[in-house]
Amino acid sequence: MSERKLFTSESVSEGHPDKIADQISDAILDAILAEDPEAHVAAETCVYTGSVHVFGEISTTAYIDINRVVRDTIAEIGYTEAEYGFSAESVGVHPSLVEQSGDIAQGVNEAFESREGDTDDLSHIGAGDQGLMFGFAINETPELMPLPISLSHQLVRRLAELRKSGEISYLRPDAKSQVTVEYDEHDKPVRVDTVVISTQHDPEATNDQIRQDVIEKVIKAVIPADYLDDDTKFFINPTGRFVIGGPQGDSGLTGRKIIVDTYGGYSRHGGGAFSGKDATKVDRSASYAARYIAKNLVAAGLVTKAEVQLAYAIGVAQPVSVRVDTFGTSTVPEAVLEAAVRQVFDLRPAGIIQMLDLKRPIYKQTAAYGHMGRTDIDLPWERLNKVDALVEAVKTVL
């Protein structure tokens, strides 16, 4: 009997409470960066019934209307009705942002290397904290992402499209998806075993209507027919009712969907969240750099699967470690790939910021439906412009 394995990933919609918080935090970051690209920002958000709290630390010359940014973000998501228990115009907004700690700022503004006499401009900025970050790529999908998280994101995005277009008028903003994919003995995806979708809805909508619409207009529109069969299981709103949702149903907090934001659990995660953080925070920028490296390694044909780990010390520019794990799929030794990566990519925080142009207000668009593998928006860490350089670097190392 051939060995078959199941792997499951989930996603959540832009109307999920934790994702509302992420989007508000990144909307604030973008608003600040639009006026002050040199700003340091760590903006956290908590949402619950009728209330939004924004707190954290910033260093900036910009002035922004946080109240307006919060309300506009909530309205764009779709919380515009008082009956939702959380609406853009009636919600209470409570900002509490303070100046960044001077002890942290001194290590970011002047890295250890700079204090030791390194005059290179890209050695001037130190990592905003210690930590480890992972990036991943695999040849399962055109965007080089694991199939379970790719499908999960597409399902909740499709729900949002149908809601906003009015094609399914009873949908409300909160939703979740989960996809279980079956893999063969060679770790190739062969079918979708289970799909779970929970979507908030108006009280008048019936379970039969919701089930039919979700299967026909969402699942079958997203998942290729080759992956679906008579044994594929669909669980649509399995509790039987999902009228109360969003922050009225559950509180939400920035940074609580880090697996949804990345690879759906298919790859390791260093633990640091992204939203609300400027690019001097390596939790965010180095995770993007690691994805950039992994994706270009796979696209170059050097590997079929790659996980890249980067690690940093606070106030130090150079990473303390760079590791490439290819799970036995590399055409050359992993040590060669690591040396090539160090040749091609400048992994100091300032190097990453320059390489990926990260001082721009580009972050709010990443705060729902994943930071990695996006095909609907142009993200610099998703570009395949280092393929040739990596191939040449491998040759020089060998």
Curated annotation (Swiss-Prot):
Belongs to the AdoMet synthase family. GO terms for cellular component: cytoplasm. This is S-adenosylmethionine synthase. K(+) binds at residue 44. Pfam families: S-AdoMet_synt_C, S-AdoMet_synt_M, S-AdoMet_synt_N. Residues 100-110 are annotated as: Flexible loop. ATP binds at residues 16, 174-176, 241-242, 250, 256-257, 273, 277. Mg(2+) binds at residue 18. It is found in: Cytoplasm. The gene is metK. NCBIfam families: metK. Keywords: ATP-binding, Cytoplasm, Magnesium, Metal-binding, Nucleotide-binding, One-carbon metabolism, Potassium, Transferase. L-methionine binds at residues 57, 100, 250, 281. Binds 2 divalent ions per subunit. One of its GO terms (biological process) is S-adenosylmethionine biosynthetic process. CDD domains: S-AdoMet_synt (cd18079). Coiled coil: none annotated.
